């Protein structure tokens, strides 16, 4: 599989995750999100950037949905539940946001 942006193809796995983390940028994220029928809002970007920060700066940590609820709630300054994240990323928040964020597929 590949993602194309401005005539340049970026390689992905069979499940749509980027092969190389370094290939990611916000424009690639928008292309992947469009393929997933997601229009990115500031809240989407908060989740994507949180996951990227955890992976890049915290020993390749890929938080599960439970940890995401706790941490994203702190970022937003409000109590949230899993529905809040599934409303943003209906295909599974950690996997779908990770895919859009250019991260490897989580276990």
PLM feature spans:
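Metallocofactor- and cofactor-centric catalytic cores in central/energy metabolism, strongly enriched
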Residues: 19, 29, 33-58, 65, ...
């Amino acid at each position: 599989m590949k993602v194309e942006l401005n005539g340049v193809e970026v390689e992905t796995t069979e499940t749509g995750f980027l092969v190389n983390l370094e290939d990611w940028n916000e424009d690639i994220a928008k292309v992947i999100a469009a393929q997933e029928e997601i229009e990115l809002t500031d809240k989407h970007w908060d989740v994507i950037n949180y996951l990227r920060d955890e992976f890049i700066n915290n020993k390749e940590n890929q938080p599960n949905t439970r940890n995401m609820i706790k941490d994203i709630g702190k970022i937003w300054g409000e109590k949230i539940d899993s529905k809040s994240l599934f409303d943003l990323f209906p295909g599974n928040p950690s996997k779908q946001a990770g895919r859009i964020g250019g991260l490897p597929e989580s276990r």
